[in-house]
Amino acid sequence: MDAALLHSLLEANCSLALAEELLLDGWGPPLDPEGPYSYCNTTLDQIGTCWPRSAAGALVERPCPEYFNGVKYNTTRNAYRECLENGTWASKINYSQCEPILDDKQRKYDLHYRIALVVNYLGHCVSVAALVAAFLLFLALRSIRCLRNVIHWNLITTFILRNVMWFLLQLVDHEVHESNEVWCRCITTIFNYFVVTNFFWMFVEGCYLHTAIVMTYSTERLRKCLFLFIGWCIPFPIIVAWAIGKLYYENEQCWFGKEPGDLVDYIYQGPIILVLLINFVFLFNIVRILMTKLRASTTSETIQYRKAVKATLVLLPLLGITYMLFFVNPGEDDLSQIMFIYFNSFLQSFQGFFVSVFYCFFNGEVRSAVRKRWHRWQDHHSLRVPMARAMSIPTSPTRISFHSIKQTAAV
């Protein structure tokens, strides 16, 4: 049957009596079919709810749909839609009161999702605190601002910005999400930009180590501006292309309502997967060189490289696995899906904390610089206290004051 004909038949089944019942309940003025734009015509929305002919200016209520997307809903609650003064239906329909009726399995999953959300919030809060502390340490310790630590600093910065944007995304409510507001789409775009910069700075980490160890190229000759361009500038046109694709092909739900792995999303997910694969190649070569050539070496530079490689070996698979999990089917059984929910939530939310620990708090240069700064502060403080006490002691016949010394020197 033709879709338009089927839709017309369904609309015909929307009874005019329902609209008259609304009027009897006091929802609007009497219908005047002869008057211009005095009522809204009977129509069906995209969900399939029947909206009967209603008077202009009336707020019409209809029972929530019994089923939608295979989920059963509570039909004792109502959805609302306004018939505008010009005789047209408002495009926005209020389904906020409609709640699904959950069976035991759905209730169990709902509970696990709520717990996973708490884990997400906790992990992001811990990560932001650790990342900000690491950022301030790199900012304060100017003595360790070599190229390697500048790269760490930028990676930490991307995680801070990404986590902040994640919190902003959580503020988007269902109505804003469905109405596809411009500011909501901007938040999604900025969030995805920082996601891409995240992985490109991980690529810069791998590129730096590969250049220094495998290619035996002097790190002093590497240009910081080149790495800054790779980490911050290259992701920009990628996200612009993704935003254009979303605008023309999937301009709905604030641009993050689709399932992971959607075709338009591969515009930015593809480069991320590519740099992850390149980083794995880099690390394979780095480990091979360390195993063959640097095993017997004990120089301080080599030790630093080894520590950096260990950190990257831990972090890169960790970050790569958390991202690639979105493309993995956890399985049909309940245990696999529940484990997937918790495992993914934990790694996604705490990865900023792991970055701070491996690249800052466990960084030997950072710890040494902090100890030196602390000892310097202690020495400075311990010198000031005795001097202040000496200045506060009154002069006596048995002691020579600072004032008397000046007078003696003058004579």
UniProtKB/Swiss-Prot annotation:
GO terms for biological process: adenylate cyclase-modulating G protein-coupled receptor signaling pathway; cell surface receptor signaling pathway; long-term synaptic potentiation. It is found in: Cell membrane. Residues 140-146, 215-221, 292-302, 365-411 are cytoplasmic. The keyword Oxidoreductase does not apply. Disulfide bonds join 14-50, 40-83, 64-98, 184-254. Glycans are attached at residues 13, 41, 74, 86, 94. Its main location: membrane. InterPro entries: GPCR_2, GPCR_2-like_7TM, GPCR_2_CRF2_rcpt, GPCR_2_CRF_rcpt, GPCR_2_extracell_dom_sf, GPCR_2_extracellular_dom, GPCR_2_secretin-like, GPCR_2_secretin-like_CS. One of its GO terms (cellular component) is axon terminus. It is a multi-pass membrane protein. Residues 1-108, 172-185, 250-265, 328-334 are extracellular. A N-glycosylation site within the signal peptide impedes its proper cleavage and function. Belongs to the G-protein coupled receptor 2 family. The transmembrane domain is composed of seven transmembrane helices that are arranged in V-shape. Transmembrane helix 7 assumes a sharply kinked structure. The uncleaved pseudo signal peptide prevents receptor's oligomerization and coupling to G(i) subunits. It is also responsible for the rather low receptor localization at the plasma membrane. Monomer. Interacts (via N-terminal extracellular domain) with CRF, UCN, UCN2 and UCN3. Has highest affinity for UCN, and considerably lower affinity for CRF, UNC2 and UCN3. This is Corticotropin-releasing factor receptor 2. It comes from Homo sapiens. The lineage of its organism: Eukaryota, Metazoa, Chordata, Craniata, Vertebrata. The gene is CRHR2.
